[in-house]
Each structure stands twice: as C-alpha cells, then as structure tokens.
Amino acid sequence: IPDGQGYEEKFYFRPGNDGFKVWDLFGARIGIGVCWDQWYPETARVLALMGAEVLFYPTAIGSEPKDADMDTSRMWRRAMIGHAVSNCMPVVAANRIGTEHGQSFYGHSFICDEWGDTLAEYGREESGALVSTLDLELARQHRASWGFFRDRRPQLYGRICQDI
C-alpha cells in the first residue's frame, strides 16, 4: 500500500498468512480480493485456479491524498474489467463513497460479465445493492473455449514469485 495520508491501512491491519480463499455461496464459487489485492492480476488468477466462478473486490478507493485532482477511477475500473476478461469470469466491484480526511471515495461500484461488459453500475455518489443475473454456465463455456487455463506455461512464471 502506498505511503501517505489516506493509506495508513498497513499500520492498523496485517495481511493474513493463510492465502486466498474460495467459498461456495448461493450455487456459485466466489473468490474475494480485498482492497489492495485488486491491483494484482495474480490475485484474480490464483482465485480462478482455485475454482472461483465470480470475483468480488470490496474496496475503499478514491482521490489521491496528495493530488486531489488525480482521478484514478478509470484506471481502477479497467483493472477490474481486465480481471474479468483475462479469467473469463464475472467481477463484482464494490467501492466506498463519501469523503474522509480530505480523501473523496469515488464509488462507481459495478458488476461486469466475463466479457467485461457492464451489467449493473452506480455512479460516483450512489449507494445501494447492485443486482444482476449471471449465467455461470455460459461463463464456464467461455473459459473453456478460450483455453487461458489450459495453455498456461507455469514453468516460465517463476520470476513472478521472486523478490526484486
């Protein structure tokens, strides 16, 4: 997590050491990446390889404390949609709204399908429960037909796990 005002999470919370988890919920296997985990494609891929069928990303992200004019909402949204597309599965991204200590959280919670198409979304200051119907069987077929998991080459990925 970056240093600076608005990014003090690492001083109050410790990351868990039991890895990512996938749960059965209402007939679907869900994987959850919390806040900072959302920026790493490895999180999405590991959850997918563990059998997740839907990726959830609850977060609190907004304006940059040192540069209030910098709006990273488009970059955040593209990263989340990238997880959906590269893992061929729906993503549910829930983001905080409001202002605290000078940081404005930009909302824009959304649900997208495995193609990255938006199924439901809120604006910058809207809150509530987004609802959408997901066709998990169609997503499974899509995942199988693209071969992203079948054609992986793990023998080439060792560097990603080494310290820099």
Residue ranges and their predicted role:
Residues 90-164:
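C-terminal beta-strand edge segments of enzyme domains
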Residues 1-54, 58-59, 63-78, 145-146:
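Active-site catalytic loop in hydrolytic enzyme cores
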Residues 77-81, 90:
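Membrane-associated lipid acylation/remodeling enzymes share a hydrophobic transmembrane-juxtamembrane segment
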Residues 52-57, 89-90, 108:
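Conserved active-site beta-strand-loop modules that form the wall/rim of enzyme catalytic pockets
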